[in-house]
Each structure stands twice: as C-alpha cells, then as structure tokens.
Design a protein with these regions (language model features):
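Two-component/phosphorelay signaling modules centered on CheY-like receiver
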Residues: 22-40
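Conserved phosphotransfer cores of two-component systems
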Residues: 53-56, 79-86
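Hydrophobic/aromatic residues positioned on beta-strands within the core alpha/beta folds
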Residues: 92-93
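Acidic catalytic/metal-coordinating carboxylates
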Residues: 44, 71-76
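Active-site residues of response regulator receiver
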Residues: 64-65
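Non-catalytic signal-transmission and effector/linker regions of two-component phosphorelay proteins
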Residues: 1-16, 22-23, 82, 86, ...
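Acidic, metal-coordinating helix/loop segments flanking the phosphotransfer/catalytic sites
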Residues: 41-60, 100
Length: 124
C-alpha cells in the first residue's frame, strides 16, 4: 500500500465517498461513520463535483479511480487539489499501484482490498 504524507486531517467536516459500487459505498460509509466522522456519498465524479461546488463543509474525499461518468477518480483528485487544496484526497483502486502513478501531490492511495482501520486513521 502506497500512502504519501497527507496535507490535512479532517478533525471536523464531512468525508465525501465517491464510489459507484453500492456495497463498497455502504461498507465505507458504515466504517467511517462508526469512527465518528460524517459522510456524504456520490456515485461518480460528476456527482462529487456537484456536491463540492454546493457545500463548504467537505473536509476529505475518498474516491475510487475506476468509475463511470465524464472523469475517473484521478481526474477528480487533480481538480480537487487545484480548486480546493484544503480538502484531503484519498484514492483507491483494485489495480496495482502503477495505476495510481498519476496521483497529484498530496493525494494518498489505498489498494483494494484495504484495511478499514488504516483508512479511517487517514481521516482522523
């Protein structure tokens, strides 16, 4: 698992989970909320962008790389880093870390399957 240093830890605020698979959405939401954090869910990057432009309380984004829609998770991560540099970004994929070679600076990567306790610690 490759996880570069994070630039921000959301002690408060919402973790936006961007995932197109319902079971992964439900599980990630439950685990992150069980850790005492608030969540929102988006099914793709386009929905995530709509949420990010309409809210100012999102502190972190946890996104899959491979998703349907107009952009993948890497493109979403790059946009977030440019437009909202204060938002922590964590990306995930079932592919090997080379898939995440295009990670923007300050973005962490978790390869699926990941340990939820390690993931939750990224947001504390």
């Amino acid at each position: 698992m490759f996880a570069p240093p994070l630039i921000r830890r959301p002690a408060a605020g919402i973790v936006l989970i961007v995932e197109d698979h319902l079971l992964v959405q439900i599980t990630a939401t439950a685990r992150i909320e069980d850790a005492g954090l608030s969540t929102l869910v988006a099914g793709d990057a386009d929905e995530a962008m709509a949420i990010l432009t309409s809210r100012d309380d999102v502190a972190a984004v946890f996104t899959d790389i491979d998703m349907p829609g107009s952009m993948d998770g890497l493109a979403l991560a790059a946009i977030i880093r440019r437009r909202w540099p204060q938002i922590q970004v964590v990306v995930t994929s079932g592919q090997r870390p080379s898939k995440a070679a295009g990670l923007p600076d300050g973005v962490a990567f978790f390869q699926k399957p990941y340990d939820y306790s390690n993931l939750v610690n990224q947001f504390r």
